[in-house]
Amino acid sequence: TAKGFSNQCATLRAVALAADYKEIEVETKRLDDCDLGPVGFIKIDVEGHEKAVLDGAHETLARDLPNLLIEIEEKHTARPLEESIAEVEALGYRGLCLRGGVLGSAERYLRERAEASERGAPAPLYIYNFIFVPQ
């Protein structure tokens, strides 16, 4: 059961809010425990809890190899973007992202971002939605 979290400010973290809000309890369960038929696509937008979702979906991912769209932001995960992407790719996926309407590899985006940082140049376009397709 998740309790004491808020979606005010687009987060599931317990935060102090100036606005009034109420708490509700919701049942949580692993995706692997949902007795689903074949799964072709999964959208994950859980404000830093991506690892927990993936950990609870290993059987589903291995069985169905669904395409994934995952919002990953370092400010929510408190870990390097490279680690989060590598974790999904280790499950047999290839990471992709859209930049200017063009689909490209997440690996290239990460490389260009690191190179810009090393040069002290502005980072490439900020990307937080990543597409993962089975390899």
Question: Model features per residue range: what roles?
Answer:
Residues 1, 24-26, 128-134:
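Extended, compositionally biased low-complexity polar/Lys-Gly-rich tracts
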Residues 3-64, 75-83, 87:
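Short internal loop-to-helix segment that lines adenine-nucleotide cofactor pockets
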Residues 73-75, 101:
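Active-site beta-loop-alpha junctions enriched in small/polar residues
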